[in-house]
């Protein structure tokens, strides 16, 4: 990497201890001398918070929130800390606290970014291929395309075996933020994520920078193990952010897209009423629609507090 600039790694942490193993691994890999950690303590309990604080040092900054403000706010704070502490950096690596990189994850991202930028300066991001926690040969996604009208992502190479796909770098609408190398120049021109707590923040940014003439890629040369999101097992409060943020994203593309998002939620609520499955999610979607109309955004705690327990049993 030209000039041996530092490579900040932003890791938001909420309730997980995986970060300690991740930091140890990255301190021993190829770019160890350049890696700088920005750990976001996202309102953790006192014991974990104290352990996170102990990571502070020459190569690590710890930013603490008094409460869980969500992944969006954590990554925003991490990007702001990067600008303050490592202003010379050209790239920033976003890494979820439950993502498990390997020794080649970061080198492959950097090498792919450098190769692409040498040919085209307007490369906004390069994402890792996400592989299954149950079978590391099975691809979950290698970036994705996204339809704002359908409100649906179409993951690349999903379900394929990694050895069968081989080493490829492909153009995508967005790549998952669980392991994403971001070009600081794109952030300076296009801005960073909006604070929407969780979900659709990385998708919206990927679509936004694309509209502004930047390009996003994903590569199978870089892999990361990450748990797959299962909407069936998610707490009802998650539905609030799925609905609220899909409406927010759809609103950037016009009334037809918003109408489509509202209709999808109508069908979900109707199915819940008819079958009795996930009926507790209905008031969260209703709150999401009311908040979208009023321009209100909430944290997880605020969402749960706003929905009466009689309407949302098991919401926590």
Residue ranges with predicted function:
Residues 100-102, 108-190, 195:
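Acidic/His-rich active-site region of diverse nucleotide-sugar glycosyltransferases
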Residues 5-11, 26, 36-40:
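Hydrophobic targeting segments
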């Amino acid at each position: 990497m030209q000039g041996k600039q530092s490579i900040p790694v932003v890791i938001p942490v909420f309730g997980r201890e995986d970060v300690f193993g991740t930091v140890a691994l990255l301190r021993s890999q190829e770019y160890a001398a350049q890696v700088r950690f920005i750990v976001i303590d996202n309102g953790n309990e006192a014991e974990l918070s104290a352990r996170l604080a102990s990571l502070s040092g020459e190569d690590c900054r710890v930013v603490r929130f008094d409460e869980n403000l969500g992944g969006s706010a954590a990554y925003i704070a991490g990007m702001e800390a990067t600008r303050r502490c490592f202003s010379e950096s050209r790239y920033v690596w976003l890494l979820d606290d439950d993502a498990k990189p390997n020794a080649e994850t970061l080198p492959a991202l950097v090498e792919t970014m450098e190769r692409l930028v040498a040919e085209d300066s307007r490369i906004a991001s390069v994402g890792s291929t996400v592989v299954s926690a149950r079978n590391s040969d099975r691809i979950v996604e290698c970036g994705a395309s996204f339809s704002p009208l359908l409100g649906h992502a179409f993951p690349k190479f999903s379900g394929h075996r990694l050895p069968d796909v081989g080493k490829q770098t492909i153009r995508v609408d967005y790549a998952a933020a669980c392991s994403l190398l971001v070009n600081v120049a794109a952030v300076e021109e296009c801005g960073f994520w909006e604070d929407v707590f969780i979900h659709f923040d990385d998708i919206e940014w990927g679509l936004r920078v694309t509209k502004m003439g930047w390009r996003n890629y994903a590569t199978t040369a870089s892999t990361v193990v990450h748990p797959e999101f299962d909407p069936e097992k998610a707490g009802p409060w998650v539905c609030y952010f799925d609905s609220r943020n899909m409406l927010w994203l759809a609103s950037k593309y016009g009334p037809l897209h918003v109408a489509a998002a509202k209709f999808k939620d109508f069908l979900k609520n109707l199915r819940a009423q008819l079958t009795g499955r996930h009926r507790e999610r209905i008031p969260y979607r209703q709150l999401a629609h009311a908040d979208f109309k009023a321009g209100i955004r909430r944290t997880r705690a605020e969402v749960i507090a706003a929905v009466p327990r009689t309407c949302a049993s098991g919401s926590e």
